[in-house]
Regions:
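C-terminal catalytic/substrate-binding lobe primarily of soluble NAD(P)-dependent oxidoreductases
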Residues: 1-169
Length: 169
């Protein structure tokens, strides 16, 4: 994946973390993948917060910075659709880091990165330049396991910044 944060996204993330630091009750809400599904608690979900070896794809994976937001939205969609994905639906997003010991080392290193720590990152109103947006890209693998153990893969790719090229015109 090659892309950049908008300043608004960075500011929202920093403000959310600052609010959670002041009000520990927010931490449980932020940690719950079902925070946007009132009254519904689905199947146990992976935390997505630590590097691990993913047995479905047989590779090491690292936490993805947008997963805490995205997973809530996916579970809300399932909720609004009347659990069309199933009551036992499990969803997580991680970044593939690689295979073997090198993959493990890469996953551990990626997990320690915080691209928005301190004063890093764009300010509100800033974001990737036109050139950065046009030269961005992404390659996403959705690996699903059916109840009978059958694996279904879907790949989504884009030749622009993932936050702008495919979501904004």
């Amino acid at each position: 994946m090659k892309g950049g944060f908008s300043g608004g996204t960075a500011a929202s993330l920093k403000a959310t973390m600052a609010a959670a630091a002041k009000d520990p009750s927010l931490i449980a809400l932020l940690a719950s993948p079902f925070a946007l599904t009132p009254g519904h608690k689905g199947a146990h979900q992976p935390t997505g917060l630590i590097p691990e070896h993913d047995t479905t794809i047989d590779a090491w994976v690292a936490p993805f910075v947008m997963a805490p937001i995205n997973t809530k939205n996916v579970h809300r969609t399932n909720f609004l659709l009347g659990q069309r994905y199933g009551d036992d639906f499990v969803y997580d997003e991680m970044m593939v880091a690689g295979l073997g010991e090198m993959g493990k080392a890469a996953a551990e290193a990626l997990a320690k990165l915080n691209p928005l720590a301190g004063d890093k990152g764009p300010k509100p109103g800033e974001g990737p330049t036109k050139e950065e947006r046009e030269n961005g890209s992404y390659d996403v693998l959705f690996a699903g396991l059916m109840p009978d153990g059958t694996r279904i893969d879907a790949v989504v790719t884009g030749d622009r910044d993932p936050g702008y090229g495919s979501t904004l015109s």
